[in-house]
Amino acid sequence: AKLNVEGSRRMAALSKELDFHYENNGSLVLMFEEEDRDSLQALYDKGQVNGVEDLQILTSKQVHEMEPHITEQLAGALYAPTAGIVCPFGLTIALAENAYDNGVRFEFGQEVFKIEKEELGNLFTIWTTDHKYEARIVINAAGVYADAIHEMVTGEIPDALKIVARRGQYMLMDKTEGHLVKSTIFQLPTKMGKGILVTPTVHGNLLVGPTAEDIDDKEGTNTTREGLEGVIEKGSMSVPTLSPRKVITSFSGLRAHSMGNDFYIKGCDEVPGFIDVAGIESPGLSCAPVIGEYVAELVKEHLTL
């Protein structure tokens, strides 16, 4: 949570430095029933502890003054005015360009099938389908396959690092619907995540989703009729005027959910120089700038830069 807060604080300045689109649009977490007041208050208290600035608990009247298209079936909401949105593709490309300018070389389209470290030395050898590489540091940021990469190196997978592919299906709506909300609209979270959100994009569309489906197929990025119907149904709980006729495309992606229910970012005690950066699901994008700095410090413990 603290990584999220600090990463969010830095995003505006980073967008100017690296030239990607960022908007400070704020967010609302909706409470539909008065009986959920304690849960909303707990979310507010957690935000205060983690240093989220200017949080407010709003009445339904205050919410509707800000967002008139929000459901009337509302008991209140948590407002975070510091929240923002980015273009995730633009951010990723900007970071990659910056890395390239600083000497990073990209090697695409290769599957890692073996990693070994010298018994008496500090050098790793990494075999892929195309090449063999040598390195003093290996950073395991392999997403849904991070547990498999860890097992190649250590021979085991810690329980907290076991990865489940959690599919999220989204619908992208036409720009004619972009006016329906200004803020990013969440629902009170459950153990499966933040529920279905409704948010404007930096390009003026409306994005609705995601689902949270734990699946066995770590390549299962297909959409399903049931999943997309659920996106509209649950999204309409927040914004009743959502219409499937305004959907211009749908897609899905996989979050790398760790069984430890948290990011798994640490150096491996058994194999010095091997660093796991795993289980990075939401809010991983917001945390990315701070995660990068934290991992750089782990690298510096083993490498003189």
Regions found by a protein language model. Name each.
Residues A1-M66, G195-I196:
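Dinucleotide-binding Rossmann-like beta1-alpha1 core, especially the glycine-rich loop
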Residues K2-V5, L30-S39, L78-E97, E107, ...:
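Short beta-strand to alpha-helix junction loop
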Residues R9, D19-Y22, K132-Y133, A141-G273, ...:
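Active-site substrate-recognition segment that forms the wall
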Residues N24, T59, F108-Q110, T128, ...:
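Short loop/edge segments at beta-strand edges and connector loops
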Residues L30, V112-I115, V198-P200, I265:
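A structural signal for short hydrophobic beta-strand segments in well-ordered beta-sheet cores
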Residues E35-D38, M66-L74, E116-F124, H257-N261, ...:
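A short, glycine/Asx- and small/polar-enriched loop/turn
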Residues L78-I137, A148, P289:
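Helical element adjacent to the flavin cofactor pocket in flavoenzyme catalytic cores
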